[in-house]
Amino acid sequence: MNDNQLLRYSRQIMLPQCDIEGQQKLLAAKVLIVGAGGLGSPAAMYLAAAGVGSITIYDDDKVELSNLQRQIAHHTPDIGIDKVISTRHVLNNLNPDVNVNAVKKRLLGEQLNFEVNAAEVVLDCTDNFATRFAINKACVIYQTPLVSGAAIGFDGQVAVFTPGKNNSPCYNCLYSSEGDELQNCASNGVIAPITGIIGSIQALEAMKLIMSIGESLTGRLLLLDSLTMEWNSMKLRKNPACPTCGVI
């Protein structure tokens, strides 16, 4: 690390759990973020600010006025441009040392497999079941840690799945692929700060995994009801009959 990096990351480096070694791991890390909306915006910004060396972000949407209430990587002048472009601009301004690979595309098929295999950690910041299950399956196949977040209304949740380690369950152990489609912000609404809270926790969990510090949310589902400010943690167990991790 050079002198500028030592100063930029000094408040993290002074933490004994992080230290120089942890910061070097962050600088060398490659993270994949799927979704540049309410969750992906804060997650990407905090990971870039913290010094994650390479961030690849996928999203196929353009910025709309209704996004600006909660998607903090996008601003009024960005309306009509690709979300990944406005996100890359924000991340580059926040920390020019970070390599940002922004792709306007729905991440599917062989490209999904390639990106998941190349990443150290994957953050699922999407809002539809089909994409979530596809990401989860790829993470199980390549044993890439997955940090999954969701927010709707006043509620949020985060879980971490580490395939192949500690008998970890996968996303499909928690949710059936035959279930109803996820509720989304467009049809049900969402209070703005809950997306920031959940996206920030996703970033924190990713950093913990990269630096191998603390206790991750592996095997737990963290739930927040922001109307009452009650946090709950549910233990998750691997399903031996899971159609994804039970057969791979």
What are these regions (language model features)?
Residues M1-I248:
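Adenine nucleotide-associated cytosolic modules
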